[in-house]
From Swiss-Prot:
Region (TRIAD supradomain): 74-288
Keyword presence, Transcription: no
Species, as recorded: Arabidopsis thaliana
Residues where Zn(2+) 1 binds: 96, 98, 125, 130
Name of the featured protein: Probable E3 ubiquitin-protein ligase ARI16
Protein's job: Might act as an E3 ubiquitin-protein ligase, or as part of E3 complex, which accepts ubiquitin from specific E2 ubiquitin-conjugating enzymes and then transfers it to substrates.
EC code(s) of this entry: 2.3.2.31
Record comment regarding domains: Members of the RBR family are atypical E3 ligases. They interact with the E2 conjugating enzyme UBE2L3 and function like HECT-type E3 enzymes: they bind E2s via the first RING-type zinc finger, but require an obligate trans-thiolation step during the ubiquitin transfer, requiring a conserved active site Cys residue in the second RING-type zinc finger. The active site probably forms a thioester intermediate with ubiquitin taken from the active-site cysteine of the E2 before ultimately transferring it to a Lys residue on the substrate.
Length: 500
């Protein structure tokens, strides 16, 4: 994990704005242009400060004129302060004399900002043929809703152009951003934890899914998860008709026991006998033998769905604990124990590590699902690794609880903090090894069955998942094997090209 060598930092929205303003101020100060003009320049150039410096250094006046940041008409006497009625005023850009009411500007800019949301192009004067650019200095004269919309437009432009190194947390309602550190490598940062408790994959934006690949995580998230829930619901809430074996759901009245199947067979929901077999006596007991159980594939889906949901509940508790740590515990530690910023970082990283580890354990059941059933040795070994990782995590969470509940003085805090630092490092290293072992495919574990037999695998045409030839459909996306040639009839390389 990244707890003891974190390659990213979590920023509040105000901190992101500060970074943005720093770039604007640098261009403004070095090339003696207003902050408003510097903002327009950076938006137009995709926030490429180096390119902006080159163009401003080569021919500043020509470049500014090209962007509509130079006067295009001799302005008449200012009437920006002249009232037009109902509190409305006439406003123009600093580069032209075309004046329009604030109402017209507001309507125009609302539409223009929405259209420019993707293109990040220039916004020109409201006059049809005028090339004067609209910047923050013009926006400042307008209403508060327009100002807020324009500020968000600038910020989103900044984020979009820096998305390789900084991204918003995708959690609903969260306003934190995650930024890679200067020595961080985007390819090496896979899982990040926001201060809101949400963990997500830097590459694909889904919730963090290590040790599962982005592709398999997407398939599980968008298709298999819903299918598994449907299968689980069917086997919990239906019974198979004794005649046609089709799953049948009880009607809305739990007291009405006679079920009508689409095959025209009527049977009792309790004992599965027909109405005639009851002979008017409905005082029956449930049958000892249930209806047809799930298939091997369905059973596997139900099993892993239960593991997934148990892991999800444990993750929710870890996230809730992290929020409480941030909102309640840390302020108390500062007040009662005199905790410094470095101390708080230690406690915060311990809580974030707990969330990361719970996320890994949750997704490890999906990794287990992707292992074909004949690789039983790998499944057993994975079960062993998961048990070790769970034990290690419980011990780490115990150390964090000790600090939270028992550190009542600066001396206590120092003692428990030292233990927590050791636990964070050891637990992070253990889960790093756990993840790496799974992502590398556990090469030291020899799979049972057909592992070394020629032609014992086929790759799904839809999702490229590797299946065994005994599987008649893909275990990941259920694409049928119909179009794949059997290994028994496939021609050997030395036979290719031979005539009859």
């Amino acid at each position: 994990m990244e707890a003891d060598g974190q390659k990213y930092s979590v920023l509040a929205k105000t901190q992101v704005r500060e970074k943005m303003m720093k770039e604007i101020e640098q261009i403004s100060e070095v090339f003696l242009v207003s902050k408003s003009d510097a903002t327009v320049i950076l938006i137009r150039l995709g926030w490429n400060s180096f390119k902006a410096s080159d163009l401003l250094g080569d021919n500043k006046e020509k470049f500014l004129a090209k962007l509509g940041l130079a006067r295009v008409l001799n302005s008449n006497s200012s009437s920006a302060d002249r009232e037009t009625g109902d509190g409305d005023y006439l406003v123009s850009t600093p580069f032209c004399s075309h004046k329009f009411s604030t109402t017209c500007w507001s309507e125009y800019l609302s539409d223009a900002l929405k259209k420019n949301k993707e293109q990040r192009g220039l916004i020109s004067c409201l006059s049809q043929d005028c090339v004067a650019s609209v910047g923050p200095d013009t926006i400042e004269q307008l209403t508060e809703p327009v100002k807020e919309m324009y500020e968000n437009y600038i910020l989103e432009s900044f984020m979009e152009c820096h998305k390789a190194t900084i991204k918003w947390c995708p959690a609903s309602g969260c306003e934190y951003a995650v930024e890679l550190q200067e020595d961080g490598n985007e390819d090496n940062v896979i899982s990040v934890v926001c201060l809101c408790g949400h963990t997500f994959c830097w590459t694909c934006g889904l919730e963090s899914h290590r040790p599962v690949s982005c592709k398999k995580a997407s398939i599980w998230w968008t298709y298999l998860l819903d299918q598994s829930r449907s299968i689980s619901w069917i086997h919990t809430n239906t019974k198979s008709c004794p005649k046609c074996k089709i799953p049948v759901q009880q009607n809305g009245d739990p007291n009405y026991r006679l079920i009508n199947c689409i095959c025209s067979n009527n049977f009792c929901w309790i004992c599965l006998r027909t109405e005639e077999q009851h002979q008017g006596n409905w005082n029956c007991s449930p049958v000892a033998v249930p209806a047809a159980g799930p298939s091997t594939v369905e059973f596997s889906q139900i099993l892993h769905l239960n593991l997934w949901e148990a892991g999800h509940e444990a993750l929710k508790k870890a996230k809730s604990k992290l929020r409480a740590l941030e909102e309640k515990i840390i302020p108390k530690l500062i007040e009662n124990c005199g905790a410094t910023e470095l101390d708080i970082r230690t406690v915060r990283e311990a809580g974030m590590l707990s969330v990361q580890c719970r996320q890994v354990l949750k997704w490890s059941c999906v990794f287990d699902y992707s292992i074909i059933e004949y690789e039983s040795t790998k499944k057993q070994y994975l079960k062993h690794l998961r048990a070790l990782a769970s034990t290690m995590l419980c011990m780490h969470e115990g150390k964090l609880d000790e600090l939270i509940h028992l550190a009542l003085s600066p001396e206590d805090f120092t003692n428990y903090k030292h233990k927590l630092e050791i636990s964070t490092t050891c637990t992070g290293n253990h889960f790093d090894g756990f993840i790496k072992e799974l992502e590398d495919g556990k090469p030291e574990v020899k799979a049972d069955g057909y592992e070394n037999e020629p032609g014992s695998r086929w790759f799904c045409d839809r999702c490229t998942f590797e299946n065994s030839w005994v599987d008649k459909q893909c275990k990941m996306c259920f694409f049928p094997l119909d179009y794949h040639p059997s290994p028994q009839v496939a021609a050997a390389p030395e036979d290719l090209g031979k005539s009859e």
